Amino acid sequence: MNISPLRVMLCAGAVALAACQPVGNGLAQAQQGLEKASAQMDSAKGELVEAQKKLVTENFSLKDDDSRLPKAELTPDGQLLIEGKPVAMSAEQKTLGLAYRTQMQGVASDGIAIGMEGAKLGIDAAASALKGVLAGKSDDEISQQAEATVKQKIKPRVEQLCARLPALLQAQRAWAAVQPEFRPYATMDESDVKDCMNKQDWNF
């Protein structure tokens, strides 16, 4: 769930639009900036829609940043692959692997939904910033209004994603308990759940 590009675009757009005067070429530049932002957002939304489709059809990578571990993936039907080769799995192991993938897919889907909502809000924020310029609002007023709107729309979705994490952790533990080959990749713990649940810094 990486929404930092949204923040960059919001900040850049708000500053650029607020810097324009509502007369002459300044207003024209602001309008051009809004059109450019709209095109960029359309492209981002297209990529997110494609990513949503891939959640169902493509393998999930299980490897974290630890380069010492071999490449591991989980197929759509719950098969564990190590370096591209299928790991021997019993019916129980495959069932638990599939249950883990289902939980992962739910979390990833929520993350993509956050990105899609953010793309829409980016356009809304840019349009509001342009209106703010026309209304003579200050830079701070425009920025605060944009940030408040983003928090109002995005925060509930982030909370929904966080609420999924306990089930994901439980599924991870259940599979790791019966699948030794998966254990090195089962790195999520209670602290990850708590960090998400207790996060109060909603600076998008």
Segments predicted by a language model, with ranges:
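Bacterial signal peptide processing site
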Residues: 21-24
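Post-signal peptide N-terminal segment of mature Sec-exported envelope proteins
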Residues: 27-57
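Short acidic, Pro/Gly- and aromatic-enriched capping/linker segments at domain boundaries
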Residues: 47-49, 56-79
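Bacterial N-terminal signal peptides that target proteins for export
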Residues: 1-10
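Mature extracellular/secreted ectodomains of secretory-pathway proteins
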Residues: 70-194
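C-terminal motif of bacterial Sec signal peptides marking the signal peptidase cleavage site
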Residues: 16-19
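Extended alpha-helical interaction scaffolds
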Residues: 27, 34, 154, 158, ...
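Charged, long alpha-helical assembly modules
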Residues: 191-204
